[in-house]
Amino acid sequence: MLCLRYFIPMLLVANAAPYFFYPIFMLSMIARKYPCPYCMIILGLLINTRTLWSDSTFFSFNRNIFDTKAFPTELKEAGYRLVRLSWIRWLAGKESIHIPWLDATIKL
């Protein structure tokens, strides 16, 4: 499953990207780093279930494919918590994380 690591940005792209972005991104990444058939099935399933995460469909014939999707209001109200790294601060409950073997402190 190491070949899927190149496709992680696909899951991090905001839902407001135009419709034509997803197939172009997939084709360019497949041309660059060809995943194994098993990982291609997993990647296809992840992209198809992407519609479950957003309030709009993946593709619709009711609008132009070059128009951007409406940004979900839940993210606007949450202060773009998914876009920034403040969710790590919320999850850890700390302002900084200390890594002793590196003698480094990461401030969130």
Curated annotation (Swiss-Prot):
One Pfam family this sequence matches: BC10
Superkingdom field: Eukaryota
Presence of the UniProt keyword Electron transport in the record: no
Annotated organism of origin: Schizosaccharomyces pombe (strain 972 / ATCC 24843) (Fission yeast)
Keywords: Membrane, Transmembrane, Transmembrane helix
One Gene Ontology CC term in the entry: membrane
Membrane topology: Single-pass membrane protein
Chief place where the protein resides: membrane
Keyword Transmembrane helix listed: yes
Name of the protein in question: Uncharacterized protein C652.01
Database matches in PANTHER family: BLADDER CANCER 10 KD PROTEIN HOMOLOG (PTHR13259), BLADDER CANCER-ASSOCIATED PROTEIN (PTHR13259:SF1)
Cell compartment(s), UniProt: Membrane
InterPro entries: BCALP
Lineage of the organism: Eukaryota, Fungi, Dikarya, Ascomycota, Taphrinomycotina
Family under the similarity heading: To N.crassa NCU05373.1.
Chain segments annotated as transmembrane: 7-27
